[in-house]
Amino acid sequence: MARLLQASCLLSLLLAGFVPQSRGQEKSKMDCHGGISGTIYEYGALTIDGEEYIPFKQYAGKYVLFVNVASYUGLTGQYIELNALQEELAPFGLVILGFPCNQFGKQEPGENSEILPTLKYVRPGGGFVPNFQLFEKGDVNGEKEQKFYTFLKNSCPPTSELLGTSDRLFWEPMKVHDIRWNFEKFLVGPDGIPIMRWHHRTTVSNVKMDILSYMRRQAALGVKRK
């Protein structure tokens, strides 16, 4: 009986996913660099079913939140909070985009066709369906990283000094601006310029407060200009 209980506990830990321990100085949020050359509108990506290429210029005039996601991570529960965030802030011009990635702890191992069923029946489960667009699985770091992630990372300083445990990170070469783990977030403004970058442990509620605060400041500046 004790062995069965021990095995059950071990399985629960494995299913709960893995989030790397805190190492080095971390910041919940970083403001992106000024004077960025180019915009996110120069890029695009294929939807998760592979049927449509969406140019990001389609989102011109919107605030766009880029999130690298994974189905078997200790942070996968953020999917539910991201759904709520999308619903709440869509009237204010926010669009969330999700990019599955298997480079952190191998926590997105399935094919593209398996990701949505996993979210629906396994994690978060309970019939969950994301209300924001997911794109094809791809790399966010390393030699084969998607070019728009190169742009985002070069536009914003990292939120942590250290990358983490190397045996849980699957890319080369490693660079100082690389994404540290699943569910790191970048906010891009209505002009296509990156604004903020959040650490993966920053709660979605804090991300929401930061976004709303920025929107209010921009609205106030607009009123002053008039």
Swiss-Prot record:
Pfam families: GSHPx
Keyword Signal included in the entry's annotation: yes
InterPro entries: Glutathione_peroxidase (IPR000889), GPX_AS (IPR029759), GPX_CS (IPR029760), Thioredoxin-like_sf (IPR036249)
Family annotation (CDD domains): GSH_Peroxidase
Keyword Cell cycle among record annotations: no
Chief location: secreted
Active-site residue list: 73
GO molecular function: glutathione peroxidase activity; identical protein binding; selenium binding
Signal peptide: 1-24
Entry's localization field: Secreted
EC number: 1.11.1.9
One example of a Gene Ontology biological process annotation: hydrogen peroxide catabolic process
The reaction(s) this protein catalyses: 2 glutathione + H2O2 = glutathione disulfide + 2 H2O; tert-butyl hydroperoxide + 2 glutathione = tert-butanol + glutathione disulfide + H2O
Tissue expression summary: Secreted in plasma.
Record keywords: Oxidoreductase, Peroxidase, Secreted, Selenocysteine, Signal
Enzyme class, spelled out: oxidoreductase
Gene Ontology CC entries for this record: extracellular space
SUPFAM superfamilies for the chain: Thioredoxin-like
Gene3D superfamilies in the cross-refs: Glutaredoxin
Family from the record: Belongs to the glutathione peroxidase family.
Reported function: Protects cells and enzymes from oxidative damage, by catalyzing the reduction of hydrogen peroxide, lipid peroxides and organic hydroperoxide, by glutathione.
Subunit structure: Homotetramer.
Record's protein name: Glutathione peroxidase 3
Organism (species): Pongo pygmaeus
